[in-house]
Regions:
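Active-site/acyl-donor-binding loops of N-acyltransferases
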Residues: 3-13, 17-27, 40-42, 98-116, ...
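Conserved donor-binding loop and adjoining core beta-sheet/short helix segment
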Residues: 1-101, 105-111, 188-218
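Short amphipathic alpha-helical segments and helix-helix/interface helices
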Residues: 70-74, 126, 173-174, 233, ...
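Short helix-terminating capping/connector loops at secondary-structure junctions
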Residues: 77, 178-180, 240
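Aromatic (often tryptophan-rich) hydrophobic motifs at membrane interfaces
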Residues: 183-286
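A structural signal for short, well-ordered beta-strand segments and their strand-loop junctions
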Residues: 81-87, 137-138, 186, 243-247
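Well-ordered, non-membrane alpha-helical segments in soluble/globular domains
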Residues: 61-70, 118-123, 224-231
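A conserved beta-strand-loop-helix scaffold within acyl/acetyltransferase catalytic domains
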Residues: 92-220, 234, 251, 343-344
Length: 348
């Protein structure tokens, strides 16, 4: 029955969904970029942040039926540069073509324990943690849970993802921690919690909710974010664990959270079943600038691939996490055509 219900919802979502057009300056090219989005508010807000770091104009199309969306895509006539269509397999059957990409909404990564500080950034975090004498403690009392929720977790999510963010409810968090299968680990400086993270105690423990007090820059500069990875790793090592799930990340390879986890030798281990179709609609310089600036992970035949985009003038140098099936490099020719330049497997 649950599968039938999910299928009905998927079909309904594929037939009719919210639509927007975002337009603004693409910073790499300095030219106007117009993006069509079909899906939910959270993904729309994500694309707005990724495509337009400054600001953009948002045009609501209201609820759009599948046939209307198809008409918009076919009749864009160069007025649109790019489309993102959120959904699952029904959406892919309706809208995805051979030249399109399918991006999972999230990927998850794991790291071996103990954590090895092999990168320059990881070593710098450890140095700053020692400099500021950061420490940690496990707490499960109501005042600590409420302080973490209102002053650490919630402000961090809102600052990063905006007012339409999904925020776990306080009662749900309290029940999880008080039940014993979730641990609240707080990062302290001078006797005050400046950051924290919730650890889900599964066979491969997972970092769940975390943040920095009031999302303050001064605490981040103390390596408070790094501490929410290092101290849980040390605690779990003491408990006999050999791996830690670093939690979910967005699939754009320049995403700060994903890049940070890569510092600790993250390996991508899983992905969401649902995602977004990325559909190039033009060969404009603004589209080329966006793709070169925001390479991403996509799904094909059950495997995850990094997709890097280059121009004749510039080669992509973004770091690619371990755990993917391979890396694909694409080149934009002078006339704006996208050509696959190279594909390498993870074993090469």
């Amino acid at each position: 029955m649950q599968r039938l219900t999910n299928n009905v919802r998927s079909v309904a979502g594929a037939v009719r969904s919210s639509g927007w057009v975002l337009e603004g300056e693409e910073p790499e090219s300095g030219l106007p970029l117009r993006v069509l989005i079909s899906g939910g508010h959270r993904q729309k807000d994500l694309i707005a942040r990724v495509a337009f770091p400054g600001s953009c104009r948002e045009i609501s199309l209201g609820k759009v039926y599948a046939w209307q969306l198809m008409s918009l895509l076919r009749g864009s006539g160069g007025e649109l540069d790019l489309a993102f269509i959120e959904g699952g397999r029904f959406h892919r059957r309706l809208f995805q073509s051979r030249s399109d990409f399918y991006l999972p909404l999230w990927v998850e990564g794991v790291a071996d324990l103990p954590l090895n500080a092999t990168t320059r950034g990881a070593k710098e975090d450890l140095r700053r943690m020692r400099k500021h004498a950061l420490s940690c403690e496990l707490r499960g009392d109501t005042p600590a849970i409420e302080d973490f929720y209102h002053n650490i977790y919630r402000p961090t999510v809102l600052e990063r993802h905006g007012p339409d963010s999904h925020i776990t409810a306080l009662p749900e968090l309290s029940r999880a921690i008080e039940g014993g299968d979730h641990k609240l680990l707080l990062i302290n400086h001078d006797g005050r919690a400046i950051a924290g993270v919730v650890i889900v105690m599964t066979p491969c423990p997972r970092l769940w909710l975390g943040g920095v007090r009031d999302s303050k820059k001064e605490y981040r500069q103390m390596a408070a974010v790094g501490a929410t990875y290092v101290f849980p790793a040390r605690y779990l090592c003491e408990q006999g664990y050999r791996q830690m799930n670093l939690g979910r990340s967005r699939v754009f390879l320049n995403d700060g959270v994903l890049q940070y986890k890569n510092k600790w030798n993250q390996r991508i281990c899983s992905h969401d079943p649902d995602g977004m179709i990325l559909k190039p609609l033009s060969g404009s310089r603004s589209l080329r600038g966006f793709l070169a600036r925001q390479p991403f992970v996509s799904i094909e035949n059950g495997g995850l691939y990094a997709n890097l985009f280059e121009t004749p003038e510039e080669k992509s140098l973004v770091g690619v996490p371990d755990g993917l099936r391979g890396t694909r490099r694409y080149l934009f020719s002078e006339n704006g055509c996208l050509e696959k330049l190279q594909e390498t497997s993870a074993n090469e």
